Amino acid sequence: MSIYVGNLSYDVSEADLTAVFAEYGSVKRVQLPTDRETGRMRGFGFVELEADAEETAAIEALDGAEWMGRDLKVNKAKPRENRSGGGSFGGGRKSYGGSRY
């Protein structure tokens, strides 16, 4: 399982997030996505702890807590959805009949 951490300060680092979550257990991984074009932090991240019980304790303690001047949103991360499905933009044209000419 992974934890979603939202409403993060744009100044936060992986080390900052690791330090906060280390109070609840052994941090396996921290991920802070950045904007592809600007390289700037996107204001959210993901943290993975060693055990589910540690993650549950961290979620309960930190959801709504103020940190770096912001109220954190902390919950179980949802599995990433496949972006290729759904509405295609012009890619699925239907052909009715034969040649245009």
Swiss-Prot record:
UniProtKB keywords: RNA-binding
Biased composition (Gly residues): 84-101
Keyword RNA-binding in record: yes
Region (Disordered): 73-101
InterPro entries: Nucleotide-bd_a/b_plait_sf, RBD_domain_sf, RRM_dom, SLIRP/GR-RBP-like
PROSITE patterns to which the protein is assigned, alphabetical: RRM
Domain of life: Bacteria
Bias (Basic and acidic residues): 73-83
A GO MF term: RNA binding
Ranges of residues in domain RRM: 2-79
Disulphide-bridged cysteine pairs: none
PANTHER family listed in its UniProt record: HETEROGENEOUS NUCLEAR RIBONUCLEOPROTEIN 87F-RELATED
Protein name: Putative RNA-binding protein RbpA
